[in-house]
Swiss-Prot record:
One of its GO terms (biological process) is L-serine biosynthetic process. Its EC number is 3.1.3.3. InterPro entries: HAD-like_SerB (IPR050582), HAD-like_sf (IPR036412), HAD_sf (IPR023214), PSP (IPR004469), SerB_N (IPR041449). Mg(2+) binds at D109, D111, D265. Disulfide bonds: none annotated. The keyword Zinc does not apply. Pfam families: DUF5609 (PF18429), Hydrolase (PF00702). This is Phosphoserine phosphatase. CDD domains: HAD_PSP (cd07500). Pathway: Amino-acid biosynthesis; L-serine biosynthesis; L-serine from 3-phospho-D-glycerate: step 3/3.
């Protein structure tokens, strides 16, 4: 299907650069941006152009993973993001520094970013307090509760639960679609990769080993006699801790902050997004999206490869 979508565009536009509308003068000296998605075809491209009311210049079309990517130039408006919702593709203005060919640093949130679940919610279900903990998690991710306070509250509900339920959750840990391909590709190009998570070491350290990541920071359950005590051991990894982790890794690896990426879905990821050269909100909460540099609503984690490959083409 992706090949058909790709060819529907290249058959109409066999040479670049060219105007989307052949009979009208294109926008001159526009800003570069990309549209991308697994179902991006000529119909979606034309519908987007009609909504925008501009004759964009199209400079390139290529594929990364299963994504079709179109490089355009035009007069940028923030409304473009709303228009892409209607055609179910993603968009990104190319006003950031990181590129695939230049090694940098990626720091990821874990729950609902690197993996498809919120681990503490799954643990709570097995401990019989699922609904209570899920409600607190949602409120915290929306930024309605102080993260540290909400975390200690959620962990407190798990007091007395057997340590074995952590293993049950880890055995069925669903990786986010596109995670493995994205990490392996970045590592191939010399990128450093890390997790900074408000989740727990039992899962973050597992992912670090599985994916051969360079670093992982997360919270630690306090466990005594094979049971959770309901306490968090040591400092809580909150928004500021995540931001400091990213800064520390930049210094340790000698990487310019302009060549770093932070990606996450919750309010507690915004601080590290602001430190990074590129902050990406991934299928994020409504409060988070307007504050992020790039928003991904439809693509999987290979969206990062789309963004980085685009910067290599401008």
């Amino acid at each position: 299907m992706q090949i058909q979508c790709f060819e529907s565009i290249t058959q109409k536009y066999p040479q670049f650069p060219t105007a989307l509308l052949a009979n009208e003068e294109p926008i001159q000296n526009g800003e570069p941006f990309i549209l991308y998605g697994t179902k991006l075809d000529i119909t979606k491209l034309e519908k987007f152009q009609q909504k925008c009311g501009q004759n964009f210049q199209i400079f390139d079309v290529w594929m990364v993973a299963k994504n079709i990517i179109v490089l355009l130039k035009g007069q940028w408006f923030s409304d473009f993001i709303k228009f892409t919702h209607d055609v179910e593709v993603d968009i990104a203005k190319l006003d950031f520094s990181p590129k695939l060919s230049q090694a940098g640093l990626l720091v990821m949130d874990m729950d609902s970013t690197a993996i498809q679940i919120e681990c503490i919610d799954e643990i709570a279900k097995l401990a019989g307090v699922g609904e209570l903990v899920s409600a607190i998690t949602e409120s915290a991710m929306r930024g309605e509760l102080d993260f540290e306070q909400s975390l200690r509250c959620r962990v407190g509900t798990l007091k007395g639960a057997p340590e074995s339920i952590l293993q049950q959750v880890r055995e069925n840990l669903p990786l986010m679609s596109g995670l493995v391909e994205t990490i392996q590709t970045l590592q191939k190009y010399g990128w450093k990769t890390a997790i900074a998570s408000g989740g727990f070491t039992y899962f973050a350290d597992y992912l670090k080993a599985l994916l051969q990541l360079d670093f992982a920071a997360s919270n630690q359950f306090d466990i005594e006699d094979g049971k959770l005590t309901g306490l968090v051991k040591g400092d809580v990894v909150d928004a500021q801790y995540k931001a400091k982790t990213l800064q520390h890794l930049l210094e340790e690896y000698g990487i310019d902050s302009r060549h770093s990426i932070a990606i996450g879905d919750g309010a507690n990821d915004l601080a590290m997004m602001n430190v990074a050269g590129l902050g990406v909100a991934f299928h994020a909460k409504p409060k988070v999206q307007p504050q992020a540099q790039i928003v991904v609503n439809f693509a999987d984690l290979t969206a990062l490869l789309c963004l980085l490959s685009a910067n290599d083409r401008i």
